[in-house]
Each structure stands twice: as structure tokens, then as C-alpha cells.
Amino acid sequence: MKKKVGIVFGGKSAEHEVSLQSAKNIVDAIDSDKYDVYLLGIDKQGNWHVNDRSHYLINEEDPKLISLNKTNEGIAVIPGAEKNQIVTSNSTKSLDQLDVIFPIVHGTLGEDGSLQGMLRMANIPFVGSSVLGSAISMDKDIAKRLLKDAGLKVAKGYAYRSVDKESIHFDSLKEELGLPMFIKPANQGSSVGVHKVENEEQFYSAIKDAFQFDHKLLVEEAIVGREIECAVLGNEKPAASVPGEILPTGDFYSYEAKYIDETGAVLQIPAKLEEPVVDSIQDIALQAFKALNCEGLARVDVFLTDDNEIVINEINTLPGFTKISMYPKLWEESGVSYRELIENLIELAIERNQRDQQLKSSRSDG
């Protein structure tokens, strides 16, 4: 019998369009002989739409113009139910019982534990990290504190909240971190709101922009090194892919280079590295995955310095699945096809849910 898979995509996030592209690639690649697909799109206002596979995206081939087809059919979620947890809000009829949800909502509310918490309350298995792993990985400040505590190297930097913005001074940070510096929102992905600054004017402009995306930001030293990414797959016994290298054609790997401009970067897969360095990167990726309580999947981004020091940049618990995204490409190079990768992720989600169901929820045995 086919499994029923709900794909949740879009979202009230600066990474909305990236999510639409990721969803399209997953829908195109999923094995229709094994899975029935249900499409649940979230628009930029946060409204949910039950979509049909034949027409769920508008301008789907253009990453600049791609958008969600808004339907008149929303949904409501019933927490605590054992079945029929999702009903259509207009007709109050339940959707077919979903076996698993594949959330591919990048960024705010989709990758930060919010969506994961709702799905846990509804007792629906879902792909990717649960609430804790998602939340702490999304917050770059908290993630780096935990990674550092686990003995892993991260860039030197400082976190500031918007209420403290008057205490952010260029001269003192320049003396502490040097130039250039990077300024980034603490809770954004895909390089949204990230700035490389070389002078005071750029610095304060970047601070202002970053605070438009989050109430907390990081000011970090620039690490001189190669940009390497490693994909991780699994639950309690995760595996790491071959590493790949990002070769940006611009100043750094920006949002445009990642998702809009196909010439914005060259992806070298596998990265040209000595075997001991590959082993070290894979080991550090797995350590980071475990330190942040990740499950299912993650992409670990690191810098490799000239003296082969590995510095973790960030960990992404719902990496992009667009046609130019590194995560699926790394697994393809490692011998796992795009279709097999989707199947593995679905099975990992179901496996974790079954494991969680074995836990006691009360002190009585009954």
C-alpha cells in the first residue's frame, strides 16, 4: 500500500521562494509508485492552502517570479488526535490520513521548531529534527555556544539584541575582530540579511538591515579559508556524505548566489581534499549534528583554513532541495540518488515516531 506523504512548503519567511523551489524538486523526484503526495502550501501571510499537484506553483521555472497558487481551501490541525488530525477548514472534512509530513519550509516558523512543535502535538511523523534540534540550530548564537562547549571550533563573535543596539560600536569591534567583519541575523538562513563589512559606514548600514530580519544579530570575525559543506543523514546512527566545496564568484556565498544566479558560485563535488582532511570534516560534521540534537538530515558548513583548521560556520536542519542545492548533490555523489534520499528521509521520520511512541507518557503502566 502506498504511503501518504504531506509536503508542507512556502511559509511566512524571507526564504519563501527557496522553499517553493525545494518543494518542486521533491515533488518531481518522489516515487509515485510508493507514495501519494498531498501538497500543503503556506503563503507569505501564513495562510495554509491545500493544493493540487497539477497547479500548485506559478512561474515555477523562474526563481525570481515563482509563487504559490493560493486556493480557497485552508486547513485546521487537531492536536492530540490519533487520526484525521488535519481537516480542511472550509468543508471540515479530514484529509486522507497522512503517514508522514515532509516539511520543507525554510527559515522562520518552519525551521525553528515552530512547525515541528505543531506536528508533534498532532502526532504526525515528520522529516527532520524535532523541536529542540530545530530551535537551537536555527539560532546561530545558541548553536555556536553549544558547538564551542562540545569542543568544536567556531568563529569569534558577539551577539547583540535590538534593545542593545546603542551599545554596538564599530571601533571596539574592529579592534577585537579586525576587518572585514560579518554581520548576520541570528535566526535566518540562506544568507538572508548577511553583510560583509569593510568600513564604518557599511557597518552601521548592515546593523540596521540585519535587525529588520531578527531581534538578535551576530558580529563575527571573517575566517579566511575554503568553504566546505558536508551532508548528514540519519537519526541515532547518522552518516556523513563526501564533502563539497563552494567557490563563490562574488565576495561571499550570498542569497543570490545560492538560489537566483546560477553563475554565482561553482559547486565542486567532491571537494579536492586529502583523505585525512575528508575524514576530519566528516567526523566534525557528525559531532556537530549530535551536539545540536539533530535528527533526519542536516548540512554542516565549515571553513577550512590554510593550516587545515576546521571552523564550523553553521548547521542547517532543513537544507535546500533546489536544483542547485548542495545537500542532495552531496548524497548523489556519495551513492544515494535524489529519489532514494527522499525515501530514506521518510523512513527515518516514521522510525523516529515509532521510537517516540514507545516512551511512557504517564507514571502508570496502563
UniProtKB/Swiss-Prot annotation:
Catalytic activity reported: 2 D-alanine + ATP = D-alanyl-D-alanine + ADP + phosphate + H(+)
Top-level lineage group: Bacteria
Annotated InterPro entries: ATP-grasp, ATP_grasp_subdomain_1, D-Ala_lig_Van_CS, D_ala_D_ala, Dala_Dala_lig_C, Dala_Dala_lig_N, PreATP-grasp_dom_sf
Binding site for ATP: 174-229
Annotated Mg(2+) 2 binding sites: E314, N316
GO molecular function term, any single one: metal ion binding
Location(s), subcellular: Cytoplasm
Cofactor note: Binds 2 magnesium or manganese ions per subunit.
Homology family: Belongs to the D-alanine--D-alanine ligase family.
Protein name: D-alanine--D-alanine ligase
Organism: Oceanobacillus iheyensis (strain DSM 14371 / CIP 107618 / JCM 11309 / KCTC 3954 / HTE831)
